[in-house]
Amino acid sequence: MNSSIKDYITVTLNYWVFTFTDGALRIIVLLHFYKEGFSPFTIALLFLSYEFAGVFTNLIGGWLSTNYGIKRILGIGLVIQSLGLSCLSVVNTDWGAVIATVWILFCQGLCGVAKDFTKTASKSAIKLTSDKLEGFESKDSRLFRWVAWFTGSKNAMKGIGFLGGGLLLTVFGFQNSLWLMVFLIVLIFIYTMTQLPELFGKKKASRTIKSFFSKNKVVNNLALIRIFLFGARDVWFVVALPVFLYSSGWTFVQVSGLMAFWTIFYGFIQAVAPKIIPETELRGIGKRLRNWMLGL
């Protein structure tokens, strides 16, 4: 097997497993603590440290991957995720609302750091392995296809994680579910560390963090738009919808199943995007962005 293909498969499997635990954790935290009496507003606050830690980590993740190697950053992400899950498993609402909330915020922050370490390193690996392959299609087209499939499959796996989280919480309860996910993280950590080259993705010349910010105004505008797009989605999808459904009498599995279906569906759309947008239209895709946005 081509070494680039092998590395791509390893990174993808790593990210799939991590994303499964990330999706499962979201639904487990939300439903468990709502059942324990936390208000919807407090639950929303629990995700603040997760998101803010992720934003900060995302800024430096690419720089760290380049300077220290993708393999190391993937490993660090998995270790931090297992630490966050382990710490969260000991939380007890008998500690009092303030102490329990602060502890959960700390654990969620760890998981947010882990998510963006793993995400940034994985996407860097996809670009690296894509650049090494040769074929009939252009480099840009190949990268577009690989990233689309990778991102789509990631979101599909997150949807499976939502459903898995509901099932785990129903069958095993809060603490045991978290420990099962730690065990899964340990397994994929061992696999990743034994399969990827030691210096995978490490560059000889060190680059400054500033160099990773795009000088292209269009890219920066898209990044800004993406923040508001995700914010508009998360307002209703992350907390409001599942809390409303659960308070309306839905079970853990029913709530997580609906969220899973929705996430898997849009992951599928992402994965087939290269089929929807022909290679000949890639260079002019920016001009069609306004029409796509109006359609959405």
Task: Please provide the spans of the model-predicted regions.
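Helix-to-loop junctions at the C-terminal end of transmembrane segments
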Residues: 57-70, 169, 269-287
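Cytoplasmic helix-loop-helix junction between adjacent transmembrane helices
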Residues: 107-154
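Central cavity-lining transmembrane alpha-helices of secondary-active solute carriers
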Residues: 45-63, 260-273
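Primarily marks hydrophobic transmembrane alpha-helices of the MFS/SLC 12-helix fold
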Residues: 74, 286-293
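C-terminal ends and interior cores of transmembrane alpha-helices
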Residues: 79-97, 296
